Amino acid sequence: MKSIMVVGTTSHAGKSLISTAICRILSRRGWRVAPFKGQNMALNAYVTANGGEIGYAQAVQAWAAGVVPWVEMNPILLKPQGDMTSQVIIRGRPVGRVNAADYYEQYFEPGWRAIEESLQHLGTEFDLVVCEGAGSPAEINLKHRDLTNMRVAKYLNAPTLLVVDIDRGGAFAHVVGTLELLEPEERQLIKGVVINKFRGQRSLLDPGIKWLEERTGIPVVGVIPYLQEIFPAEDSLDLLERKTHKAHADLQITVVRLPRIANFTDFDPLESEPTVAVKYISPKQDLGHPDAVILPGTKTTIADLILLQKTGMAEAIQNYAASGGTVLGICGGYQILGQMIADPEGIEGQAGRYQGLNLLPIRTVITGQKIARQRQVSSNFPQLGLPVNGFEIHQGRSRVEPQGDSQAFQPLFDDVNLGLVDSCQSVWGSYLHGLFDNGPWRRAWLNRLRQQRGLKSLPTGVANYREQREQMLDNIATEVENHLDLTLFLP
């Protein structure tokens, strides 16, 4: 099986970006390429056509390769749920919940079998597999149970790229230290080093590169500049630090960064709008007076609801809505906006019933059976008849409660189970992830906010975010290709 492995000296070294770029580079050269990450821990997920869950980053890599995402591209997905526990998803299907201490005892062997079977399947369907590692391949305390770094590289005998982030400092120490901690047979697979996120004058770096190559015997095959493209992140650590100021922003939209925020990639299309500034705040911060407030998806809906109530953010959102402010809840955020959430089986922790924000007339019951599926629907609001594509991932079932005024709340789509909006179009809720990827729907929703400000409406005949994402992937691939020599890695 032809393959390339990409590992990093640390988390956030740029493995996902480099792997994605290589997928697009080789696809443009005529290769049929598949991405692969044996095990991923992420709350950003995507639902494949057959209803399986994989990490969103692997879906992006599949799109970069010009292919449809498959569950085999990410056979193990761990979704943290708090209290050191994670939901375990193997080959796209949830198989249990486990704490960190017991995970490898229970799932190491079935996990490795899933990895082997997935790689074998991809090998029969594609010319080359681009494999991405996780964290560092040199974590001494974890190496004996590695499922996604050098164990995969050795299994495939894959030529391996070692990526290091020079922007954080200490890059040379990271490279040398990582190589020193690898076993001899692992180190032999490292065919090149990639220095990522470089800013400055290349000539000042050259003496360091010369020393590194002489010290390690491994060539530096790429120096990638710091790229300004918005690339989908795998975790939410950087959300509060994102630069949100835009000189010409007409609208300010605030997203509450819940502790277990999930699928915050839902908001990348909003961030791409030139006239919209998206700000992420913690539940402990002041809500302020934005044009709209969004409660995103979450893996622990009840725990995050309780936190919103304890911090006063729940009351702030209720007061904001009462004053005419626009509130949108997506997935878990939609459930939080309802009247009540019940967890009779203790799926999320302690069994019980919890009062929601009471902004939408729904009651939700958390069940053990997860819904994960792609959807194609038609909108009722903010404009009738717009095609909307997205996907559902949730374990709650929500029921709309009868209202005295039958017109007070209306179905958001032609499927009444996917969401609601009030008669003033101020409080919105939906189970649909990828809502803002739909360009005409996004613009119609933003235009309502603009009208409230007395601003001119924006054209709604715009392309879906997919086209902007394709351009982003092309830009990233071109930049990386200009600074990366893949000669040693291709047959």
From Swiss-Prot:
User: Which HAMAP family does the annotation name?
Assistant: CobQ (MF_00028)
Keyword list (alphabetical) reads: Cobalamin biosynthesis, Glutamine amidotransferase
The record lists the organism as: Trichormus variabilis (strain ATCC 29413 / PCC 7937)
Q: What does this protein do?
A: Catalyzes amidations at positions B, D, E, and G on adenosylcobyrinic A,C-diamide. NH(2) groups are provided by glutamine, and one molecule of ATP is hydrogenolyzed for each amidation.
Where on the tree of life does the source sit, at the highest rank? Bacteria
In this chain the GATase cobBQ-type domain maps to: 250-441
- Pfam families in the record, alphabetically? CbiA, GATase_3
Q: What is the lineage of its organism?
A: Bacteria, Bacillati, Cyanobacteriota, Cyanophyceae, Nostocales
Which molecular function GO terms apply here?
Answer: ABC-type vitamin B12 transporter activity; catalytic activity
The pathway noted for it is: Cofactor biosynthesis; adenosylcobalamin biosynthesis
Q: Which family does it belong to?
A: Belongs to the CobB/CobQ family. CobQ subfamily.
Q: Which GO terms describe its biological process?
A: cobalamin biosynthetic process
* Protein name per UniProt: Cobyric acid synthase
Task: Name the catalytic site residues.
Answer: 331, 433
Carries keyword Transmembrane helix? Answer: no
